[in-house]
A protein has these predicted regions:
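Short N-terminal binding/cap micro-motifs at the start of the first secondary-structure element
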Residues: 14-18
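Catalytic nucleophile loop
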Residues: 76-100
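Amide-donor transfer/coupling interface in amidating biosynthetic enzymes
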Residues: 7, 102, 116-224
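Extreme N-terminal starter segment of soluble prokaryotic enzymes
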Residues: 2-6
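Short gly/ser/thr-rich secondary-structure transition/capping motifs
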Residues: 29-37, 113, 130, 147-150
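Short, solvent-exposed loop/turn segments at secondary-structure boundaries
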Residues: 61-65, 105, 125
Length: 224
């Protein structure tokens, strides 16, 4: 039975990456929405799985589309439907649940290890190298399990029940996506970056092969 996977994309250089590959591999149908550009969101009834990607905006921004996304997230939560939030998307889930989005203790832009904090989802390595592109984080919902931490920022991911995952970092970019992120938003890496990596270094690092596998594992877990 195929699923309709609705992806909310907010930055032209931050697309679904390997999430698209997962949709194809599982015979699911992916629909990409750009709510900040076109003001259109799917309904909960036409959403089997919701993916909320990163954004240069913050959930704290007083914008209609930002608030409307949280209305959709709330309906998804109420119906126990699967949600994957990445970066801004993870923060949107937490804010929907009433938690704060605040400045992280460090601005992380580039590649850095994340460490698995919970064994509920099997088949994930204890340590992975992920792409970070953020300076804010959310509080971890008390009803959720802390899923990942980095050396500089504890709140890197959470698992809520068996159907909602929030990640503060990026497992989804493949190498083409990393180039697209870094060449278009490279200035962000050069300002007060606690990982001290340049756009060129970020691109040349390459993508660890495991990251796509873990992305598939996480999506399979919430989609089951």
């Amino acid at each position: 039975d195929f699923m309709r996977v609705n992806v909310l994309q907010h930055a032209p250089n931050q697309g679904p990456g390997s999430i698209q590959a997962w949709c194809h591999a599982r015979d699911n149908e992916m629909f990409v929405y750009h709510p900040g550009n076109f003001g259109i969101l799917p309904t909960v009834d036409e959403t089997d799985l919701l993916v909320v990607l990163g954004s240069p905006n913050s959930p704290n921004d007083d914008l209609d589309w930002v608030k409307n996304e949280r209305v959709l997230i709330r309906k998804m939560l109420d119906q126990h439907k699967p949600i994957l939030g990445i970066c801004f998307g993870s923060q949107q889930i937490a804010k929907t649940l009433g938690y704060k989005v605040l400045d992280a203790p460090a601005k992380e832009v580039g590649w850095a290890p994340v460490y698995l904090q919970d064994q509920t989802i099997t088949g994930i390595p204890d340590k992975l190298t992920a792409l970070h592109w953020h300076e804010q984080m959310s509080e971890i919902p008390t009803e959720a399990k802390l899923l990942f931490s980095s050396d500089l920022v504890k709140n890197q991911g959470f698992l809520l029940g068996d159907n909602v995952i929030g990640l503060q970092f990026h497992f989804e970019p493949q190498i083409d996506n990393v180039r697209e992120i870094a060449i278009n938003d490279g200035a962000y890496a050069l300002e007060n970056n606690d990982l001290h990596q340049t756009p060129t270094e970020i691109i040349n690092h390459g993508v660890p092969e495991k990251n796509k596998d873990v992305m598939f594992t996480l999506l399979d877990f919430i989609a089951k």
